[in-house]
């Protein structure tokens, strides 16, 4: 595997006024796809990382915090998730976590950028861990908006929809998938007891974008839970918003979460019943402005 030696530095934007300086020791690939610049590099503090348009999307040393927190609260809240739709998640780690649940019969991953998927297959094996080749997995290279409309027209149904997209403010690719009207479409794809979960960027640096996503979920789902997890390679806490048509994720006890994980054969590094309780109990972060 060819690589360009470092060290060099990545200036990763946190907001329009702040940034994270990341030391890069080696670069494996730099590629411009139709939609974005794709970089895979070895970083000093975070290990190998997938970087899209100067934003770290996933890194070996901390991606489990992001992906386990995105996937398992919703999957554990549903008593028997069989059909799961993933929008985004090109590196395959979200798919990997979904497929840990023995209840899953079908996991459809839809990503607009096939180049990201191919780069991940070759350069990020620890991310996907063979998930792309699982017989339950179906990888579709298509705009998520188009796929959802097509699935709606076909009458397809899912138990859980997981939105692992780029931030609503970092690029134009995914913006329409965060709009209130899109969450209404997602609701139409779900069975009567279905759930959706989306990452929603950061509520501290980008409160307006976060509130837009929150409004979209609340407009279509009767039960909504907000939670966040600190991701070191991002330099901030990532926010998640979970919408449910029937089950309340905040009502699950740690014992019930652990029982469901155990019965489904799910092994995790970070997420557990105790973690679930913590995620659902702590407030999100916003700027506290004092005069």
From Swiss-Prot:
GO molecular function, one term: spermidine synthase activity
Residues that hold S-methyl-5'-thioadenosine according to the record: 36, 111, 143-144
Nucleotidyltransferase recorded as keyword: no
Function: Catalyzes the irreversible transfer of a propylamine group from the amino donor S-adenosylmethioninamine (decarboxy-AdoMet) to putrescine (1,4-diaminobutane) to yield spermidine.
Chain ranges of the PABS domain: 5-245
EC number: 2.5.1.16
Organism lineage: Archaea, Thermoproteota, Thermoprotei, Thermoproteales, Thermoproteaceae
Pathway: Amine and polyamine biosynthesis; spermidine biosynthesis; spermidine from putrescine: step 1/1
PANTHER family (alphabetical): THERMOSPERMINE SYNTHASE ACAULIS5
Keywords: Cytoplasm, Polyamine biosynthesis, Spermidine biosynthesis, Transferase
Root EC class: transferase
Name of the protein in its database record: Polyamine aminopropyltransferase
Tree of life domain: Archaea
Location of the active site: 164
Pfam families, A to Z: Spermine_synt_N, Spermine_synth
Cellular compartment(s): Cytoplasm
GO terms, biological process: spermidine biosynthetic process
Family affiliation: Belongs to the spermidine/spermine synthase family.
Binding site for spermidine: 67, 91
Any one of the GO CC terms: cytoplasm
Record-linked HAMAP family: Spermidine_synth (MF_00198)
Keyword flag Cytoplasm: yes
Catalysed reactions, as listed in the record: S-adenosyl 3-(methylsulfanyl)propylamine + putrescine = S-methyl-5'-thioadenosine + spermidine + H(+)
PROSITE patterns: PABS_1 (PS01330), PABS_2 (PS51006)
Complexes and interactors: Homodimer or homotetramer.
């Amino acid at each position: 595997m060819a690589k360009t030696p470092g060290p060099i530095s990545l200036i990763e934007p946190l907001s329009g006024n702040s940034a994270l300086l990341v030391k890069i020791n080696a670069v494996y690939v730099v590629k411009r796809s139709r939609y974005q610049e794709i970089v895979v590099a070895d970083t000093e503090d975070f290990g190998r990382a997938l970087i899209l348009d100067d934003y770290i999307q996933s890194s070996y040393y901390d991606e489990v915090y992001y992906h386990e927190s995105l996937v398992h609260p919703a999957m554990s809240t549903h008593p028997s998730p069989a059909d799961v739709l993933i929008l985004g998640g090109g590196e395959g780690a979200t798919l990997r976590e979904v497929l840990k649940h023995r209840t899953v019969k079908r996991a459809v991953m839809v990503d607009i950028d096939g180049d990201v998927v191919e780069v991940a297959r070759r350069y990020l094996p620890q991310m996907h861990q063979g998930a792309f080749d699982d017989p339950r997995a179906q990888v579709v290279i298509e705009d998520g908006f188009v796929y959802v409309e097509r699935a709606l027209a076909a009458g397809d149904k899912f138990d859980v929809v997981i939105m692992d997209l780029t931030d609503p403010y970092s690029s134009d690719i995914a913006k329409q998938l965060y709009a209130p009207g899109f969450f209404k479409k997602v609701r139409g794809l779900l069975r009567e007891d279905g759930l959706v979960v989306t990452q929603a960027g950061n509520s501290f640096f980008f409160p307006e974008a976060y509130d837009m996503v929150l409004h979209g979920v609340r407009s279509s789902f009767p039960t909504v839970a907000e939670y966040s997890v600190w991701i070191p390679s991002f330099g901030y806490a990532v926010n998640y918003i979970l919408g449910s048509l029937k089950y309340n994720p905040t009502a699950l006890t740690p014992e019930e979460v652990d029982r469901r994980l155990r019965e489904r054969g799910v092994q995790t590094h970070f997420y557990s019943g105790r973690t679930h309780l913590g995620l659902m109990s702590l407030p999100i972060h916003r700027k506290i402005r004092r005069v």
